[in-house]
């Protein structure tokens, strides 16, 4: 069986995702599509708008054959780690092709860039470190400048969010298993972070979340497939943003000592001291981020650091990667059965039977995620919710 892998968040699953999924199956001529998906918290350092189980239902209903969870210690990291660990899981599942959307849309350019960076890695990293010597320069800017220095601006614009993720997927494949084919499709209509919908049936997940958080499910439905609308209509919990977790984060910042926070993943350069001061002044999470924002620290980096503090994620090596199955179609079940003996990573379908150290961070993250009123039905869900299976 030929397998295509995709890296997703489905926050929530919308018409653009449906187009991407359909093209993945059509263009790669695969028998099975495997999605590695962020769980309770996503890459920009935010809570998912609805629980991972609801997003898994959306994915399966739309045609994904297997949904596996990207562990939170990787899912909430910067693009390099996010991509490396996503590819590690998909490679363990023996995918033939990685399919992704990008603003650039030319597969060969991603592969060319990745191969060149690997061949010139020492010089590339040195250029980044030199740029970071300027305390006003963010890591993202330093990385972009190093890339432009190596290639010029013609090959690939890595200031675009899908391009930079695609490049890191290509880089991870080049380092881990260059035999995995890389295929992209151009992103259509809506920009990744567009806050407003600007098309009849395609809108960014950002714009859709904004509508849902404002209570405009009917308007948001224009941009969702019927299968996602059905999941949302049956969902009885709240739509979530970091504002819901602000009291918990504020308590944590006020209660903890600076030395304690210094041991949290992503905390560096004394940023915890500024965060503790900002927490006392801010009245909301958006207010907190606005107070904290500088040229060196992007919103995404600040949110990721704040999230690590909320989750009490210690700056120690994360657990070994594992394959946590959230859901499968009948085809996905057949594929897993065929390959199970040849999969090098631990496979988790029943949490209570898994090695406790593997899932420690993810279980804590889900426990914190479900502290919000209205999510009582999902509390301890990692223990009593089996993989969702469809016929």
Swiss-Prot record:
UniProt GO BP: tRNA modification
Residues that bind ATP: 7-20, 101, 162, 187
Pfam families: HIGH_NTase1
Superkingdom as given in the UniProt entry: Bacteria
Coiled-coil region(s): none
Cystine pairs: none
InterPro entries: Rossmann-like_a/b/a_fold, tRNA(Met)_cyd_acetate_ligase
Cell compartments where the protein resides: Cytoplasm
GO molecular function, one term: tRNA binding
EC number: 6.3.4.-
SUPFAM superfamilies named in the record: Nucleotidylyl transferase
Family annotation (Gene3D superfamilies): HUPs
Reaction(s) catalysed (UniProt annotation): cytidine(34) in elongator tRNA(Met) + acetate + ATP = N(4)-acetylcytidine(34) in elongator tRNA(Met) + AMP + diphosphate
GO cellular component, one term: cytoplasm
Broad enzyme group: ligase
Keyword terms, alphabetized: ATP-binding, Cytoplasm, Ligase, Nucleotide-binding, RNA-binding, tRNA processing, tRNA-binding
Main localization of the protein described in the UniProt heading: cytoplasm
Family the UniProt entry places it in: Belongs to the TmcAL family.
Job description of the protein: Catalyzes the formation of N(4)-acetylcytidine (ac(4)C) at the wobble position of elongator tRNA(Met), using acetate and ATP as substrates. First activates an acetate ion to form acetyladenylate (Ac-AMP) and then transfers the acetyl group to tRNA to form ac(4)C34.
Protein name: tRNA(Met) cytidine acetate ligase
Organism, as annotated: Listeria innocua serovar 6a (strain ATCC BAA-680 / CLIP 11262)
């Amino acid at each position: 069986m030929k397998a295509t892998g995709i890296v997703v968040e489905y926050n929530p699953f919308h018409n653009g995702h449906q187009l991407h999924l359909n093209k993945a199956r059509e263009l790669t001529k695969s028998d099975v599509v495997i999605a590695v998906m962020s769980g309770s918290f996503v890459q920009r350092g935010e809570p998912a708008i609805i629980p991972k189980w609801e997003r898994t239902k959306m994915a399966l209903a739309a045609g994904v054959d297997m949904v596996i969870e990207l562990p939170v210690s990787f899912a909430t990291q910067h693009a390099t780690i996010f991509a490396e660990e996503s590819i590690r899981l998909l490679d363990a599942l023996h995918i033939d092709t990685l399919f992704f959307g990008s603003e650039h849309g030319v597969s060969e350019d991603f592969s060319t860039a990745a191969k060149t960076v690997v061949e010139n890695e020492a010089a590339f990293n040195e250029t980044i470190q030199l740029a970071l010597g300027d305390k006003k320069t963010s890591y993202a800017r330093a990385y972009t400048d190093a890339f432009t220095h190596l290639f010029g601006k013609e090959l690939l614009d890595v200031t675009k969010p899908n391009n930079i993720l695609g490049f890191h997927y290509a880089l991870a494949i080049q380092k881990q298993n260059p035999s995995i084919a890389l295929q992209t499709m151009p992103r259509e209509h809506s920009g990744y972070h567009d806050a407003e919908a600007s098309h009849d049936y395609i809108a960014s997940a950002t714009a859709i979340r904004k509508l849902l958080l404002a209570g405009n499910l009917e308007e948001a439905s224009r941009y969702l497939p019927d299968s996602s609308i059905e999941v949302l209509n049956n969902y009885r919990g709240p739509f979530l943003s970091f504002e819901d977790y602000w009291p918990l984060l504020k308590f944590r910042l006020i209660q903890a000592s600076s030395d304690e926070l210094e041991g949290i993943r992503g905390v560096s350069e004394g940023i915890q001291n500024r965060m503790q001061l900002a927490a006392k002044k801010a009245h909301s999470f958006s207010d907190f981020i606005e107070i904290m924002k500088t040229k060196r620290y992007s919103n995404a980096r600040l949110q990721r650091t704040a999230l690590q503090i909320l989750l009490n994620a210690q700056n120690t090596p994360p657990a070994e990667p594992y394959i946590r199955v959230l859901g499968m179609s009948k085809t996905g079940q057949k594929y897993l059965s065929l390959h199970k003996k040849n999969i090098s990573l631990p496979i988790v379908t029943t949490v209570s039977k898994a090695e406790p150290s593997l899932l420690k961070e993810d279980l804590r993250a889900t426990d914190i995620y479900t502290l919000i009123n209205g999510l009582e039905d999902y509390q301890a869900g990692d223990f009593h919710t089996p993989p969702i299976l469809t016929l």
